Amino acid sequence: ATPNFSYTAHDGSSGTLKDFRGKQNLLLVLFSWPESRVRLDQLRTASTAITTTGTAILAVPMTDLPPDELTSIAQGMPFPVITQGGREISRSYALFRRTLSIPDLFGEGTRQSHMEFLFDRFGYLRARWIPHGDGPSWTDMSLLTQQITQLNQEREILPPPGDHVH
C-alpha cells in the first residue's frame, strides 16, 4: 500500500490521500520551482479536461518554499497546491522513483525535480511519470486523459488498500 498523508492546501482545503478512495482518481504532482513551471502551466490549462474524467489534481512542492513564493505559484491554480505537509509527502513518494531491479534509476542518491503519480479511484497507485527518465509521454494531455479513461473503465478487483504502517 502507498503511504497515506495529510495535507493543507492554498485554497483552504485539507484532507488525506485516503479521502479520494471510492470517489475519484488522483494525479499527485510533486514539483520543484521554478523547474516545474512549464508543467504546472500545462496542468493549469488542461485541468478541466483532467477533472472531467473524475480525477483530482494535487500539486506538492518538493522543498519548503518561502510563503510569498508559494502564494505566487498557487495564485490562479484551479487545483490545490499543498502548503503544509509537502516535504513529508515528497520524501515518502520519492521512494517510488525506484524499481526492484534498479534501486536508483537515475544514479545513486539522485532526487528528481518533478514526478507525477496516478492513483485509481480505488486507492491504488497505477502509474508514475518522471519526465527526466520516462520521456515526454504525459506532456501529451490527450494521452494522459486516455489513460485515465481506461482506468475508469476498470472494475474493482481488490478492496481498497490498507493503511501503510512501518
Language-model regions, residue ranges each:
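Thiol-/selenol-based redox modules, centered on thioredoxin-like
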Residues: 103-166
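Short active-site neighborhood of thiol/selenol oxidoreductases, capturing the structured segment around
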Residues: 15-43, 57-60
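Short, ordered coil/turn segments that flank beta-strands lining enzyme active or ligand-binding pockets
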Residues: 10-13, 121
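Loop/turn elements at helix/coil->beta-strand transitions in domains of secreted/extracellular proteins
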Residues: 22-26, 52-56, 77-79, 121-124
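N-proximal helix/coil linker or "cap" segments that precede and/or mark the start of modular domains
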Residues: 1-6, 21-22
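Short, surface-exposed loop/helix-turn segments at secondary-structure junctions
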Residues: 93-105
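Residue-level structural signal for beta-strand termini and adjacent loop
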Residues: 19-20, 95, 131
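Structural microenvironment flanking redox-active thiols in thiol-disulfide oxidoreductases
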Residues: 37-91
